[in-house]
């Protein structure tokens, strides 16, 4: 382990999580925003559903760990909501089982510590035409529809309301933009840089508005090694140094 110890923010989910550290990804955005404040830890698993996640949740988040995460952001549902395959194989999970799985995951995370906070992300919509267009010749037919996405998204939101958890309703949020189909995805399913900006912005909004003590909003968290130093850059007048520990001018977008 490296020091100093920082709060941990864990991203736990399927491909939208695994790919979130790619160029312009929402995980990368959070890493930039929380630089020198918290460690963003990636636990993303391409193709996974809530059933597979439930099988390993106690290994990813052991209850006896010396340090527990301050925040866990969870996304499963996109693969669960795929239409069932005629073979009985594949990632589809019936709706009631999906809700039960997500509830068990939430309860496990709540048991980690009194200060572990949780945000669920619901299933975003898809560009159905583009999904069909990009069908891989190596895979049996992948059936994703917005009717199914909405059903699973609504169930996730309802579960979070029942458990008192924070949730980002991605299905509704994405569709606030008229051109969401063309700007939010790379292949009709996975997120473009613009789609990731929407996700990051919603997460940061939820964290800012949440009444958590201590606050996990990035502006409320101390910056590591932020003391003034004679080794800092020298000001234009040449008489003093300028502390750069809080600079954000290089961000592509100035986040609140």
Swiss-Prot record:
Instruction: Report the subcellular localization.
Output: Secreted
InterPro entries recorded for this chain? GDSL, Iah1-like, SGNH_hydro_sf
Q: What tissues is it present in?
A: Specifically expressed in anthers (stages 8-12).
Q: Which residues form the signal peptide?
A: 1-27
EC number, as in UniProt: 3.1.1.-
Does the keyword Signal belong to this entry? yes
Which Pfam families does the record cross-reference, listed alphabetically?
A: Lipase_GDSL (PF00657)
Which terms does the record give in the GO molecular function aspect? hydrolase activity, acting on ester bonds
* Glycosylation-annotated residues: 49, 79, 243
Which Gene Ontology BP annotations are present?
A: lipid catabolic process
What cellular component terms from Gene Ontology apply here?
extracellular region
Q: What is this protein called?
A: GDSL esterase/lipase CPRD49
Give the organism the record lists: Arabidopsis thaliana (Mouse-ear cress)
Gene encoding it?
A: CPRD49
């Amino acid at each position: 382990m490296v020091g100093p110890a920082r709060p941990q923010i864990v991203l736990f989910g399927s491909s939208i999580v695994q790919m979130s550290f790619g160029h312009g990804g929402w995980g990368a955005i959070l890493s930039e925003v929380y630089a020198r404040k918290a460690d963003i830890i990636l636990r993303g698993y391409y193709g996974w559903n809530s059933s597979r996640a439930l099988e390993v949740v106690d290994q990813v988040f052991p209850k006896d760990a010396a340090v527990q995460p301050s925040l866990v952001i969870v996304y499963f549902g996109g693969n669960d909501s795929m239409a069932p395959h005629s073979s009985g194989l594949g990632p589809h999970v019936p709706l009631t089982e999906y809700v039960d799985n997500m509830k068990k995951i939430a309860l496990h995370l709540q048991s980690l510590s009194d200060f572990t906070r949780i945000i669920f992300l619901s299933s975003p919509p898809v560009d159905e035409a583009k999904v069909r267009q990009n069908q891989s010749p190596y895979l049996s037919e992948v059936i994703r529809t917005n009717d199914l996405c909405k059903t699973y998204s609504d169930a996730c939101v309802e579960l979070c309301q029942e458990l008192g958890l924070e949730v980002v309703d991605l299905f509704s949020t994405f569709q606030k933009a008229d051109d969401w189909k063309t700007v939010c995805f790379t292949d009709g399913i996975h997120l473009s840089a613009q789609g990731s900006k929407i996700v990051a912005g919603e997460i940061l909004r939820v964290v800012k508005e949440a009444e958590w003590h201590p606050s996990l909003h990035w502006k409320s968290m101390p910056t590591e090694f932020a003391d003034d130093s004679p080794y800092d850059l020298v000001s234009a007048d040449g008489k003093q140094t300028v502390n750069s520990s809080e600079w954000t001018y290089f961000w592509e977008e100035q986040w609140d």
